[in-house]
Amino acid sequence: MALNLQDKKAIVAEVNEAASGALSAVVADSRGVQVAAMTNLRKQAREAGVYLKVVRNTLARRAVEGTAYECLKDVFVGPTLIGFSNEHPGAAARLFKDFAKENKAFEIKAAAFEGVLTDPEVLATLPTYDEAIARLMMCMKEASAGKLVRTIAAVRDQKEAA
């Protein structure tokens, strides 16, 4: 589909705006994936707060100029599907990772977080805010239980020594 200059400028501006406000970005090759599966991926992305766009490589390179995702410029080769996480840094990577398990033709090319190329697997395993709070509370709970056990053991040792 031929795009005129105004359409190209609009696409670059739209992707640049998405990149400017994003927490992380993931680039993938969706060649060979069924249309129904891609529609399902787009639906899941909307629910997860991930902006998805299939972009021409030249337009993608121009769109990320001046953003934290300029490091992805060399990755824009071949069919490019780019996802920007807006609510949680690992959302797009987790979404793409789960989708790649179901669709063997789907290939994750690269991921970026805070202006640095990152392993998509690592980015996908980042805990959500709620998970991080839960882990912190577990650590705090375990620490107090450990103190109680050590205190009781110390009292027991004192009684045995006496």
From Swiss-Prot:
GO terms for cellular component: cytosolic large ribosomal subunit. PROSITE patterns: RIBOSOMAL_L10. The keyword Oxidoreductase does not apply. GO terms for biological process: translation. SUPFAM superfamilies: Ribosomal protein L10-like. Keywords: Ribonucleoprotein, Ribosomal protein, RNA-binding, rRNA-binding. GO terms for molecular function: large ribosomal subunit rRNA binding; structural constituent of ribosome. Pfam families: Ribosomal_L10. The keyword rRNA-binding applies. Part of the ribosomal stalk of the 50S ribosomal subunit. The N-terminus interacts with L11 and the large rRNA to form the base of the stalk. The C-terminus forms an elongated spine to which L12 dimers bind in a sequential fashion forming a multimeric L10(L12)X complex. Belongs to the universal ribosomal protein uL10 family. NCBIfam families: PRK00099.1-1. This is Large ribosomal subunit protein uL10. It comes from Vibrio cholerae serotype O1 (strain ATCC 39315 / El Tor Inaba N16961).
